[in-house]
């Protein structure tokens, strides 16, 4: 993905949303790339016996989508000086369409503060984050 030219944001501005689909193939690719081969993510028989009832995406895969949205919004400012405090709220599952969005809550002392979240198509919050980016 090519980062767009950074734009100036003010408190209350919405960040450009991003949508991604979670598939078992994407989860498996993430497992290979990250080295995280927990059977909860890749073994459907095992995962069916857990509280989740099936495989789920790695939480960090969901946060990667959030980071992709922030890169699109802030470009190099996010990549070189951004900070995120995230909370996982619900699992992402194969077949989910994840929409990532956020808004600027405050601009103070050269820092943009944002709230962001990832939701599935049912509107359930999968992850939320407080974000700081150099203005």
Regions from the PLM with identified roles:
Residues 1-15, 88, 92-135:
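HotDog/MaoC-like acyl-thioester-processing domains
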Residues 1-55:
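Catalytic strand-loop segment that frames the active site of acyl-thioester-processing enzymes
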Residues 11, 18, 26, 36, ...:
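A generic structural signal for short beta-strands and their flanking turns/coil linkers
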Residues 32-36, 71-75, 121:
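Short, intrinsically disordered, mixed-charge
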Residues 48-57, 61-104, 112-113:
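Hydrophobic beta-strand-centered segment that forms part of the acyl-chain substrate-binding groove
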């Amino acid at each position: 993905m090519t980062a767009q030219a950074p734009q100036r944001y003010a408190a209350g501005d919405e960040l450009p949303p991003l949508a991604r689909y979670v598939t078992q193939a994407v989860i498996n690719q993430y497992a290979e790339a990250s080295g995280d081969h927990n059977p909860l993510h890749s073994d459907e028989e095992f995962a069916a016996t857990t509280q989740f009832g099936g495989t789920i995406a790695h939480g960090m895969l969901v946060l990667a989508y959030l980071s992709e949205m922030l890169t699109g919004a802030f470009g190099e400012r996010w990549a070189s000086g951004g900070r995120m405090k995230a909370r996982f709220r619900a699992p992402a599952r194969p077949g989910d369409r994840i929409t990532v969005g956020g808004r600027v809550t405050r601009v103070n002392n050269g820092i943009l503060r944002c709230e962001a979240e990832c939701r599935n198509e049912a509107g359930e919050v999968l992850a939320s984050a407080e974000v700081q980016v150099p203005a």
